[in-house]
């Protein structure tokens, strides 16, 4: 399984896509790079409310306080959006996550303007859920 790119490489790769079809394919590819969740992790406690698709997000904290995010979805594009969000929050502490605004990154990628309203709402639900989980840890 290939590693996810960092924030800057994500932005570079995204800008190299010739059109939105290529960008969607890249997002789907990122989702395919996510490590699978175990059947036990596909539980009610990890499900994200407010997403049209099924979305599960697991948050762990290492001894140094850095958060590790893992997730899954039953929809390929949504799984890719999960990967994008995880890239933006990569190597952050719980406090960093609660303070970091991902929306400017979405604007740089012109992401939200090319998503359906239900996917945009689901993306916001994911961000709110991750920030809420991080706030409970910090």
Swiss-Prot record:
Location(s) in or outside the cell: Cytoplasm
Residues at the active site: 51
GO biological process: iron-sulfur cluster assembly; sulfur compound metabolic process
Pathway(s) annotated for this protein in UniProt: Cofactor biosynthesis; iron-sulfur cluster biosynthesis
Keyword Electron transport: no
Pfam families, A to Z: SufE
Cellular component GO terms, alphabetical: cytoplasm
Transmembrane segments: none
Keywords of this entry: Cytoplasm
UniProt KW Transcription keyword: no
Stored InterPro entries: Cysteine_desulfuration_SufE, Fe-S_metab-assoc_dom
PANTHER family: CYSTEINE DESULFURATION PROTEIN SUFE, SULFUR ACCEPTOR PROTEIN CSDE
Family: Belongs to the SufE family.
Subunit structure: Homodimer. Interacts with SufS.
Physiological role: Participates in cysteine desulfuration mediated by SufS. Cysteine desulfuration mobilizes sulfur from L-cysteine to yield L-alanine and constitutes an essential step in sulfur metabolism for biosynthesis of a variety of sulfur-containing biomolecules. Functions as a sulfur acceptor for SufS, by mediating the direct transfer of the sulfur atom from the S-sulfanylcysteine of SufS, an intermediate product of cysteine desulfuration process.
Record protein name field: Cysteine desulfuration protein SufE
Organism (species): Klebsiella pneumoniae subsp. pneumoniae (strain ATCC 700721 / MGH 78578)
Gene that encodes the chain: sufE
């Amino acid at each position: 399984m290939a590693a996810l790119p960092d924030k800057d490489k994500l932005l570079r790769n995204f800008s190299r896509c010739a059109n939105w079809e290529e960008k969607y394919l890249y997002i789907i590819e990122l989702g395919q790079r996510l490590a699978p969740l175990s059947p036990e992790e596909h539980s009610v406690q990890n499900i994200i409310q407010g997403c049209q698709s099924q979305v599960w997000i697991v948050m762990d904290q290492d001894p140094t306080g850095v958060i590790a995010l893992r997730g899954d979805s039953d929809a390929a594009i949504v799984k890719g959006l999960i990967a994008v969000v995880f890239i933006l929050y990569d190597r952050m502490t719980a406090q960093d996550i609660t303070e970091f605004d991902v929306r400017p990154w979405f604007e740089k990628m012109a992401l939200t303007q090319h998503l359906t309203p239900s996917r945009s709402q689901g993306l916001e639900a994911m961000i709110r859920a991750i920030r809420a989980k991080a706030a409970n840890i910090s």
